[in-house]
From Swiss-Prot:
<comment type="similarity">
    <text>Belongs to the RapZ-like family.</text>
</comment>
<keyword id="KW-0342">GTP-binding</keyword>
<protein>
    <recommendedName>
        <fullName>Nucleotide-binding protein BH3569</fullName>
    </recommendedName>
</protein>
<dbReference type="Pfam" id="PF22740">
    <property type="entry name" value="PapZ_C"/>
</dbReference>
<dbReference type="GO" id="GO:0005524">
    <property type="term" value="F:ATP binding"/>
</dbReference>
<dbReference type="InterPro" id="IPR005337">
    <property type="entry name" value="RapZ-like"/>
</dbReference>
<feature type="binding site">
    <location>
        <begin position="14"/>
        <end position="21"/>
    </location>
    <ligand>
        <name>ATP</name>
    </ligand>
</feature>
<dbReference type="InterPro" id="IPR053930">
    <property type="entry name" value="RapZ-like_N"/>
</dbReference>
<dbReference type="GO" id="GO:0005525">
    <property type="term" value="F:GTP binding"/>
</dbReference>
<dbReference type="Pfam" id="PF03668">
    <property type="entry name" value="RapZ-like_N"/>
</dbReference>
<comment type="function">
    <text>Displays ATPase and GTPase activities.</text>
</comment>
<dbReference type="InterPro" id="IPR027417">
    <property type="entry name" value="P-loop_NTPase"/>
</dbReference>
<keyword id="KW-0067">ATP-binding</keyword>
<dbReference type="InterPro" id="IPR053931">
    <property type="entry name" value="RapZ_C"/>
</dbReference>
<keyword id="KW-0547">Nucleotide-binding</keyword>
<feature type="binding site">
    <location>
        <begin position="65"/>
        <end position="68"/>
    </location>
    <ligand>
        <name>GTP</name>
    </ligand>
</feature>
Amino acid sequence: MNVKEEIDIVIITGMSGAGKTVAVQSLEDLGYFCVDNLPPALIPKFIELIESSSGKMNKLALVIDLRGQTFFDQLFESIDLLDQSSLSKYNIQILFLDAKDAKLVQRYKETRRSHPLAKHGLPLDGIKKERELLEDLKGRAQQIIDTTDLKPIQLREKIIQRFSCEEHHSFTVNMMSFGFKYGIPIDADLVFDVRFLPNPHYVDHLRPKTGLEGEVSSYVLKWTETQQFIEKLEDLLSFMLPQYKREGKSQVVIGIGCTGGKHRSVTLAEHFAKVFANEYMMHVSHRDVEKGKER
């Protein structure tokens, strides 16, 4: 292997039941060589072995979970060692998968599996203890994905979208609409509240529609306060996004929330995605728009 060639290293971790198996399978499909439960202290030696092999292997994914909970300090030491040895050679990212407690409990009940830390078979006790153990690791993560509302195929799509770029230093802006009544997305870097804007929900013929439809978006965008908000947020993001990119972040998740995630937030997420489409790789999603249709 050419010693100057960069090696992408993704460390997959997170809450038990949050989707690490799907993440591994998705990265394997992208050409990553995946290793499950490698002791963190052996990571530098393992990478040396990979580099000295005759085969070209420049994309690695390593799964670290509670089976190796005593090794988390060694994980940080190994990452720091690799960073110090050659900043230009290793592109290391920690991918942390998370989900709300209630969803994790539901998944354990559906699969009839026991949480690795659960006492007396009570998954919620294990989940709470696991969160405490993983707090520092989550704080070091460059990528956090909330899988609460994601089906396996949706998680796969999200991982492929985040890791399939030809240029791994490319910068992606994820614009996400959501409803505050369903909770703030935990993987958002920035959150903006647009509940102060006039609400199409109170217009009878607009209530069943969404911000993806012209009538609703026209209604939301016609107000003076909407245009003032757009102008101010465009100015703020025009300043902030280049700073995030310069800092070395590979992606930023921007959450725009209204009450139900159906009208105002959807309209504005679509608007800002179009505004910045010529400057950045944009991805827009509407977390709660289907929930809104059901109500």
